[in-house]
Amino acid sequence: MSITPREIVSELDAHIIGQTEAKRAVAIALRNRWRRMQLSEDLRQEVTPKNILMIGPTGVGKTEIARRLAKLAQAPFIKVEATKFTEVGYVGKEVDSIIKDLTEVSMKLVKEQAVEKNRIRAQDAAEDRILDVLLPPAKDQWGNVQETDNASTRQIFRKKLREGSLDDKEIDIDVASQVNVEIMTPPGMEEMTSQLQSLFEGMSPNKTQKRKMKIKDALKVMLDEEAAKLVNQEELKQQAIEAVEQHGIVFIDEIDKICKKSGNSGGDVSREGVQRDLLPIIEGSTVNTKYGMVKTDHILFICSGAFQIARPSDLLPELQGRLPIHVELKSLTKADFERILTEPNASLTLQYRELMKTEGVTIEFTQDGISKIAESAFRVNEKTENIGARRLHTVLERLMDGISFDANERAGEHIVIDEKYVATALNDVVENEDLSRFIL
């Protein structure tokens, strides 16, 4: 992917307000993946990614940056919560499962790309199978197929099939029968589950079963079957592993929750252990997955945390060293809230306008109304827990509560949400100090 850092930041700007430093850091890291691939083979092996630690309060855009980056990257990407993992020896998921899950994501990605690449051939083959059911080949008295008489009719039906005029017609088709084996295992033993499922599914013979379904559904099933025939599974595995090793990105959220708090001498079960287990994976090691061995040397790791109780210095020194780029995200201001309400491509005000439009109600947010909403959300954050932009959801839901409830009875109305309307709807926030009802 040859998208430039400026283009990456511009794309992130369309969805996330502020946090320029964090956007620049991830943009450079993403571009460096492409730069590295342009180097000679020997030098490429020596260039390792500069992992990132994003520090900032909740609700300022850390997770959203990761989510949008995943779409931009067009590469294997996985987001995990550090708190979901336990030290080796404890019940729960081990950190190796991060790489295994990333490989699964990569496998799905390359499979989709391979299917898309062969889609035209698979589409033709699937259509032929449907047409064989609709128009069984005519045979003469000796059993030979008469193609000439049938060819023109098949072309007419193929055209109808592509136009969708036969979509709702039901037909009987032969589809590959799959043995679905559900195995329940304790947490942390997911790999054994997948291996047993593969074993049982592999033991079942390749049988087909007749199923009655609409042509539009049958076409999808047959398209998948034909595409699978055109794909080399072993080749896909190699491509998936290479994609993980060279382009994989892991986003680890809530990294601060596995820190041992300063001055706390209590037994934080497996917290430091999780950090120690993360060390070799981030530094570079080999993890065994069901598709083969995966080297983690060139996987990019982006960690994030609020660090409200713990501090970045509470991380193990070795782990700090493996996260050389530290980016601090700033708390959101009232002006930021105003921009969040209006500027993103799918801003909150736009979402509410479009939702109410489905009921025939026209909503208009005035500038002073938006300013009042931002002020209310900012004030609640200051008075209680600061949950960043998530507070806007709470305030807007309260503001729109009455309209949302009886919108179906108000079709055709034009409702203007200005400063006066907001002040009335959020009266208990504006006038009272008791803000408990807004605390999530």
From Swiss-Prot:
Self-association and partners: A double ring-shaped homohexamer of HslV is capped on each side by a ring-shaped HslU homohexamer. The assembly of the HslU/HslV complex is dependent on binding of ATP.
Lineage: Bacteria, Pseudomonadati, Pseudomonadota, Gammaproteobacteria, Pasteurellales
Compartments where found: Cytoplasm
HAMAP family per the UniProt record, alphabetical: HslU
Function, in words: ATPase subunit of a proteasome-like degradation complex; this subunit has chaperone activity. The binding of ATP and its subsequent hydrolysis by HslU are essential for unfolding of protein substrates subsequently hydrolyzed by HslV. HslU recognizes the N-terminal part of its protein substrates and unfolds these before they are guided to HslV for hydrolysis.
Entry GO CC: HslUV protease complex
Pfam families: AAA (PF00004), AAA_2 (PF07724)
Keyword Ligase: no
Positions contributing to ATP binding: I17, G59, V60, G61, K62, T63, E64, D253, E318, R390
Record protein name field: ATP-dependent protease ATPase subunit HslU
CDD domains associated with the record: RecA-like_HslU (cd19498)
One GO term of the biological process aspect: proteolysis involved in protein catabolic process
Gene name, Swiss-Prot/TrEMBL: hslU
PANTHER family for the chain: ATP-DEPENDENT CLP PROTEASE ATP-BINDING SUBUNIT CLPX-LIKE, MITOCHONDRIAL-RELATED, ATP-DEPENDENT PROTEASE ATPASE SUBUNIT HSLU
Organism: Haemophilus ducreyi (strain 35000HP / ATCC 700724)
